[in-house]
């Protein structure tokens, strides 16, 4: 009897999560077609072209004699540039390439709604969680962002995923959850350097209010550091600085 009830509730939750994802995709696909970017522009075009042609994350630089140099990128976090570069490996060209990126962002945004629902259930009832998840799915900026060549959708997805695993870690404290929190935290630092502060505050919160052991806190910091270490090493070699 207990197992039957458990499976019924589990199937019902999967059904709700699936509907949230499908609903969110249904809302976003027309926006991608109507308002989606037509191509890579400005710094994204330069960075991706240099990754494709020279296998280096760099900007073009012209000196006074109009000689062209590649100037390695320092000030822009690298993750989103590599994200859009990844889709170029499928030999897609023109609008097909751009649409693939935008649809992938729409999918990530839709999945983030389902994850947001699971986080909401920690604090609210199922009805309230479903209502605020639908509102979140329909939030105009969240809908529009997936139609642009911008890191917002990827950042939102990873941030929500981070907090989902963070709350799971506070409750269960397993090594696997330590790894997920650390790795996703590292990816977010590679996407937005300001996330260092959020990661630090989150770990401080877990340490003070939930008595998470110092060993686990240090392990999270270590794995996060390992995640971002290739970029740090590259900056030290090229610029003799870590940022």
Predicted regions and their residues:
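Transmembrane signal-anchor helices characteristic of membrane glycosylation enzymes that use polyprenol
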Residues: 12-41, 223-236
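Short helix- or helix-capping micro-motifs
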Residues: 21-27, 132-140, 164, 185-189, ...
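Short acidic/glycine- and proline-prone juxtamembrane loop motifs at membrane-interface regions
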Residues: 39, 141-155, 191
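Extracytosolic helix-loop segments that constitute the early lumenal/periplasmic catalytic or substrate-binding loops
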Residues: 40-72, 79, 87
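Loop-to-helix entry region of an early transmembrane alpha helix in multi-pass inner-membrane enzymes
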Residues: 74, 78-85, 90-111, 133, ...
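Transmembrane-helix signature of polytopic, membrane-embedded enzymes
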Residues: 95, 111-138, 156-157, 173-179
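Transmembrane-helix motifs of polytopic, lipid-linked glycan transferases
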Residues: 100-123, 161-165
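Membrane-interface transmembrane helices that cradle and orient dolichyl/undecaprenyl
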Residues: 123-126, 162-178, 188, 206-210
């Amino acid at each position: 009897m207990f197992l039957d009830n458990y499976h019924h509730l589990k199937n019902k939750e999967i059904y709700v999560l699936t509907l949230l994802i499908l609903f969110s995709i249904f809302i976003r696909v027309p926006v991608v077609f109507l308002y989606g970017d037509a191509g890579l522009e400005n710094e994204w075009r330069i960075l991706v072209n240099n990754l494709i042609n020279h296998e280096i994350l760099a900007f073009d630089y012209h000196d006074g004699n109009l000689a062209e140099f590649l100037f390695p990128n320092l000030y822009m976090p690298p993750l989103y540039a590599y994200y859009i570069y990844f889709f170029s490996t499928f030999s897609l060209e023109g609008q097909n390439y751009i649409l693939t990126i935008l649809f992938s962002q729409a999918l990530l945004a839709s999945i983030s709604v389902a994850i947001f629902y699971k986080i909401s259930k920690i604090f609210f009832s199922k009805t309230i969680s479903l209502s605020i998840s639908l509102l979140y799915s329909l939030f105009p900026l969240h809908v529009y962002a997936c139609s642009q060549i911008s890191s917002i959708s990827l950042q939102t997805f990873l941030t929500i995923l981070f907090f989902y695993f963070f709350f799971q870690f506070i409750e269960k404290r397993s090594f696997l959850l330590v790894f997920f929190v650390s790795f996703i935290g590292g990816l977010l630092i590679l996407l937005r350097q300001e996330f260092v502060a959020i990661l630090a505050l989150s770990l401080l919160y877990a340490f003070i209010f939930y008595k998470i052991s110092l060993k686990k806190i240090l392990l999270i910091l270590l794995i996060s550091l390992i995640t971002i270490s290739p970029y740090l090493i590259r900056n030290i070699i090229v610029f003799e600085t870590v940022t």
